[in-house]
Amino acid sequence: MREYGYESLSYGMSMTGAVYMQKLEDRVVELASGGVSYFKFDGLFGHLNIRDFELQGRGTAAMPQLGLEGFSSNDERLNDSRYDELKIYYLTAGTERLMKIFNRLGEVNPDIFIAITNGAYLSPWWLQYVDVVWLINAGDAAKGNNRNGELVYRDNVYHQIWKEENTKFPMNSVFNHEPKKTGPDETPEAFRDYLYMNLSRGTGFIELYIKTEKLSYSDWDILADGLKWAQKVFPLFHNVRMHGGSPRDNEVYGYSAWNKTQGYLSFHNPSEKEQTYNVMLDRSLGLLPETDMVYHVSSPLGSVGSRVKASYRYGDMLSLTLKPGEITVLDFTNLASSFSSLGNEGISSICD
């Protein structure tokens, strides 16, 4: 790109280069004008643990007093704090340039959807300009030897960010590299349970990581059912929150989201022993205290049977015994006609 007059760095392009950034703006605005309604900006300012900085003063401050002769834009020596001011100048100028591009896209289409999946951090400030931000926990793929381990790895990051650190960022506006399905080496039940637990996090931006040639007919059916469920409960996602204990400590945990007429609760027992979990249906889960209505219970994972009551009100205690590795999702609605019939079998959803 350099030979064509574009400002390049060691790893990628300069986010403050006048020629390159104007070309980028012109092109994405052209695409938006042609009907493209989704943009994913990835690799901004580098990628994962690699960072690229503008050292030549192109569109940002130059600091020759730092003696940068012989430095590359991703030089490890830039980790020294004496270069922080220069790096801040570049990141600030580059971010301001991106803001102008995001605003231009919004002018073309107010409903345009923008994901910034690198070069950002979990601050609600970003949501003035974009719709979702990558979780940025340096783990594209959730680690673990099985689905249970994958869920614990990612859900523990959620627990750390929202329960331990109390980060003020809406959970539905984060992006993960999930759900994934890359092979046939699991039962349909294991994939189903993993999928619904994953979706119950309330991520408003669901990007599938699948190898289509590896999916069976049942996998496609499960995927379709899961996405239909996510679409049904999507209006609840902006209220989603985490409940329960620590995934890392093998305590029962899950996610909860409600509005005035419906809600859901997911549960995961990551341990190798049976556990009984008690939770009160109140404001801490997101229920509205002024709502005096009966919520009927069903489950997208099967019949709810006698393990929970057929209906609940605000302030009721829900008690559920979960088998080792079990996943359960409960739907609550005050419209009796919209939930599946209650059977005699319990929910049995073991994540292998």
List each model region and its residues:
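Active-site-proximal substrate-binding groove within the catalytic cores of carbohydrate-active enzymes
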Residues: Y90-G305, M317-V329
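Short, basic/aromatic beta-hairpin or loop at an interaction surface
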Residues: E76-D80, L301-V308
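C-terminal beta-strand-rich structural cap/linker in extracellular carbohydrate-active enzymes
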Residues: K309-D352
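Aromatic- and carboxylate-enriched substrate-binding clefts and catalytic-loop regions
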Residues: M1-F169
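Active-site-adjacent structural elements in folded domains
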Residues: E7-S14, R248-V252, G315
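Generic beta-strand structural signal
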Residues: G35, W258-K260, Y312-R313
